[in-house]
Amino acid sequence: MGSVRVEDFELVNVEVPDLKEEGDFLVRNIWMSVDPFLRIYMTKGTKHAPPFELNKSLEGGCIGKVIESKSSKFKVGDYVKANFGWRKYWIGKETQSEEKSISKVNSTLGPLRSFLGLLGITGITAYVGLFKICNL
């Protein structure tokens, strides 16, 4: 297994394709999550998901802003949270919203980065563990 090293990663520039279909929208990532569970997917994966593929972008939580849209659900200027991970831009489709956990973020509730921590799955996990299981 070994430790993850800088040499294990590569920064690659790719062309961002044009939006082709109704329901497509282009997002520029602002925040990306680096969670401990990602380490599992760098080796063997789990019963819930296969390991990361070599020479592909790492998947994981991200917060971004819709900068172009052919979607009635996700409009230019909307902030969204998804599992598209480590990339500067990504194209989402309305039909992927459940599969890739794409959802709008209400930026008035707190700093955007909070939706990957305190207001995200890690915050919910901590809350349930402390207050529902440990009864604190």
Where are these regions (language model features)?
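Intrinsically disordered, low-complexity boundary segments flanking structured domains
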Residues: 1-2, 53, 78, 105
